Amino acid sequence: MPTVAQPSRKERRDAARRERVEREAALAAAGARRRRLSRLGAVLAAAAAIVAVLVAVSASGSGTKTASRTAVAGTSQTAATLSGIPQHGLTLGSAKAPVRVIEFADLQCPFCRDYSLSSMPQLIRDYVRPGKVRMEFRSLAFIGPDSVSAARVAQAAAQQNKLWNFVDLAYHNQGKENSGWATDAVLRRLAGAVPGLDVNRAFAARDSAAVTAQLNAANALANAKGVQSTPTFLVGRGSSLKAVDAAGLPAAIKAAVGP
């Protein structure tokens, strides 16, 4: 039986070295693959995160835009009624308009709301917009605390010539009498829906001495003219003003404007 030749020591060392090199190469290749997969995973995770952020931002932006258009009822109606008509303080319409109408109202009075939303837009369109009548708003706050809260913000909005916008939106979003609906959050939301109104400035001014004085003046005028309910209107030319209720307002304006 032939004898199998045994590898020499050198040959065994060379073989062991080759195995070691091959093993190290395999380990290095496996490590490289793991690193590539890890980097790829990180890239994919980062990409997914970016996509998620973009989707969230897009959804948030879309939601914000939608909320700004739809969260406050009456925004479009208010714009349609008042857009383009000059305002100065309490007054809506041209200062040169020959006929003057002073409205006494409480912003949580449901009768004031109903008349303002149902009949006032046509009166404004027919008489105020053409420059025949100028209207002045006087806030009365006799129903309760919500009346006071809303009246103060409305009066503060008048300092920025935005009273009529705020008043109209307040009527569109009016809650039940003395239900506590006129919270700061609600009033801020309404004020924020008025184009061009600096909400922070209005809220800073609502408790000012100037606002208090104007509300007191409105009450004094109402008492002097015998106003017993809201809405009540004074209609006429110059200082000759006649008190009428909502039902009598259209005829009184028509008579004051003349043919």
Predicted regions and their residues:
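Extended, low-complexity, charge-balanced
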Residues: 1-2, 93
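C-terminal cap of thioredoxin/glutaredoxin-like
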Residues: 2-59, 190-259
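C-terminal region of N-terminal signal peptides and the immediate post-cleavage residues
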Residues: 52-73
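Short extracytoplasmic/periplasmic juxtamembrane "stem" segments immediately C-terminal to an N-terminal membrane anchor
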Residues: 67-89
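A short beta-strand-turn-helix
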Residues: 82-99, 127
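Alpha-helical scaffolding within the catalytic cores
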Residues: 87, 119-121, 220
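Conserved short-loop catalytic and cofactor-binding motifs
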Residues: 89, 141, 154, 175, ...
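Structural alpha/beta surface segment adjacent to cysteine/selenocysteine redox centers
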Residues: 97, 102-192
